[in-house]
């Protein structure tokens, strides 16, 4: 519990820093496809060209009232994943250092813009981060964190069609790289490969209902 105390402050603070484009705009940023993602869950239909899972993710958050909770949730998800990466890769870093790093990212990169956009595009870079954590440092994660990351990776793959080829190529490459770096005695090397295969297979399976529409 003590190890999680910095996150109670750091994650919400970092999430707030990532929301400045929406605050500057006066509203979450919309794109041409945003309407499709919103309408699928509201009107109960599944378009062949847009997976429904991002629509289902948004519906309980906006509840057809306001879209602000969606971008707040996206900012919190992003901040938590960045905090998790910081904690396992640089365990000596303080919460203040983490928030300062996110402040730099929020000013110098495009990250806050995709976080504030009502599109699943933010899941592409986050998927890379999640797969790297699961592959290279699974032993530094708690069992609950590994389960959450596997669930998030599956959701991210299922939410965007472009994530399918990305994950199918990246996951086995990362698993092989992790095994090669760690050598034959690296713990979890076999679990890495199985986990990558299961995540990819599940995410791809969720896409299968839309394949007939591609013909």
Residue positions per predicted region:
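Transmembrane signal-anchor helices characteristic of membrane glycosylation enzymes that use polyprenol
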Residues: 4-29, 106-107, 204-214
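Transmembrane and membrane-interface helices of multi-pass
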Residues: 12-20, 96-110, 115-117, 125, ...
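Transmembrane-helix motifs of polytopic, lipid-linked glycan transferases
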Residues: 68-92, 103, 107, 126, ...
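Extracytoplasmic catalytic/substrate-binding loops of multi-pass membrane glycan-assembly enzymes
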Residues: 24-37, 45-57, 61-65
């Amino acid at each position: 519990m003590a190890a999680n105390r910095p996150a109670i402050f750091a994650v919400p603070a970092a999430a707030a820093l990532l929301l400045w484009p929406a605050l500057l705009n006066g509203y979450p940023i919309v794109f041409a496809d945003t309407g499709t993602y919103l309408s699928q869950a509201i009107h109960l239909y599944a378009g062949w060209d847009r997976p429904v899972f991002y629509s289902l993710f948004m519906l309980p958050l906006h509840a057809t009232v306001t879209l602000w909770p969606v971008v707040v949730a996206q900012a919190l998800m992003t901040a938590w994943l960045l905090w998790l990466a910081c904690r396992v890769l640089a365990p000596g870093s303080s919460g203040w250092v983490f928030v300062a790093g996110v402040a730099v990212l929020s000013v110098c990169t495009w990250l806050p813009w995709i976080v504030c956009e009502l599109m699943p595009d933010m899941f592409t870079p986050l998927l890379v981060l999640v797969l790297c954590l699961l592959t290279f440092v699974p032993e530094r994660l708690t069992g609950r964190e590994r389960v959450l990351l596997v669930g998030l990776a599956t959701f991210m793959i299922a939410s965007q069609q472009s994530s399918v080829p990305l994950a199918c190529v990246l996951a086995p490459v990362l698993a092989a790289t992790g095994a090669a770096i760690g050598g034959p005695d690296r713990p979890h090397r076999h679990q890495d490969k199985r986990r990558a295969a299961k995540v990819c297979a599940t995410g791809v399976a969720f896409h299968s209902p839309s394949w007939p529409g591609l013909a």
